Amino acid sequence: MLKKNDIVEVEIVDLTHEGAGVAKVDGLVFFVENALPSEKILMRVLKVNKKIGFGKVEKYLVQSPHRNQDLDLAYLRSGIADLGHLSYPEQLKFKTKQVKDSLYKIAGIADVEVAETLGMEHPVKYRNKAQVPVRRVNGVLETGFFRKNSHNLMPLEDFFIQDPVIDQVVVALRDLLRRFDLKPYDEKEQSGLIRNLVVRRGHYSGQIMVVLVTTRPKVFRVDQLIEQVIKQFPEIVSVMQNINDQNTNAIFGKEWRTLYGQDYITDQMLGNDFQIAGLAFYQVNTEMAEKLYQTAIDFAELKKDDVVIDAYSGIGTIGLSVAKHVKEVYGVELIPEAVENSKKNAQLNNISNAHYVCDTAENAMKNWLKDGIQPTVILVDPPRKGLTESFIKASAQTGADRIAYISCNVATMARDIKLYQELGYELKKVQPVDLFPQTHHVETVALLSKLDVDKHISVEIELDEMDLTSAESKATYAQIKEYVWNKFELKVSTLYIAQIKKKCGIELREHYNKSKKDKQIIPQCTPEKEEAIMDALRHFKMI
């Protein structure tokens, strides 16, 4: 039985989702940092229990031909670049495999082609935002990054994947904090003033925002500090202060102050100008975010008469990018400042057909349904936890033709796609996009398309009355939905209405592009909703 500090020869057979090497010894699975498949190593046992263990490389006996020999190991130890030891082409293959595996293991999907991960031409120095802790190390104020799985600061000046100008601003601020003798935060003692430095830089504009995260409002000689850093970096247009006096791992507190200039920077995305506030979500890799959003737009095959819902809309980047190509855009975002940014960004780009609300995505979707808004396309870009079940059901109930799902967590995306399939949607396309080179993270765009009503014959249901038969012309689908809601407070989908119409012998216009699948799984209308729809059909004298 292996025990701590034993040294054993092993072969690495796989990588975990987070990029650790996997070795198998005596029926145990070991996870080893900085080890790649096909490598043979001498491994020192760090920790072991009944089924798994952790080890570290003592010596490489055989190295992988795909190893990046030039990586500074500090980037591995800190987690900044937890896949940086793997050559970039192999990183892309690894990410494609992660997407395929998650879709198969979680959603049971194996018959949809997953495209090769879309990579970056120069996969370093891309991050447009830095969040850097400030701590005391060996008696000196330092900036850097925490060692992986700890709060021990590793001093760093070059962050490898960040915009080099941002790195320079961080170093300049560090030196000024030392010069003005401002005390770094001490987590154990709950003392000190400066907790974090946050720096944003526009990829195209070059505008810079600096955020000082402090434990209390008063910062001694802060005006002089700001004056000095602006002398070095005149591109700074915003200096903000965030006050966080809580014993928490969260970076930001609730109170914000503008110390210099404006409370935002401006940058461009897909040809539009965007104001970006300190707290607003904005993709950290502008170059690849444009490719990500363009992929989602291309997947959705937008038309002039489309009505688009932009869920988790942030500051409006994707919704405003499509607004000029569609009839209407309705966006929802939970962060009030981001919603205000969205509205300002719409004005900034002379866009009048984009409408934004501050709410949860599921509440907004329900309210839009009540208001009779009938989307044809839904764009979702949720946080890592994915979509809620109530949102998925509400979005499916709209009967939208296409759902473009942008995901930063393929596991939750696969889970959500499984539910969408149960509600009558089919996964059509999947494209991974590498927004975070040198790390294990991957973004994915998936296209879901609404299945047709019949299990064996595709039937197209047109909401435009020009395409309705004479039997259907007495009421539109929207009118039937409104009637059912007003009388029964039940929400019914276009799919359910079509099923009951068909059951009643009302002719539906058949679509000549018949489905090639003989056994599609289609959700069926519940008895309660069937009776409500029947009542509506009788009301409109359709039966």
Swiss-Prot record:
GO MF annotations for this entry? rRNA (uridine-C5-)-methyltransferase activity
This protein's superkingdom? Bacteria
The UniProt entry annotates the active site at 408 (nucleophile)
Q: Which UniProt keywords apply?
A: Methyltransferase, S-adenosyl-L-methionine, Transferase
TRAM domain segment(s): 1-59
Stated EC number for the protein is 2.1.1.-
- A Pfam family annotated for this chain is TRAM
Q: Which residues bind S-adenosyl-L-methionine?
A: 283, 312, 333, 381
Q: Which CDD domains match?
A: AdoMet_MTases
Family, per entry: Belongs to the class I-like SAM-binding methyltransferase superfamily. RNA M5U methyltransferase family.
UniProt name for this protein: Uncharacterized RNA methyltransferase spr0932
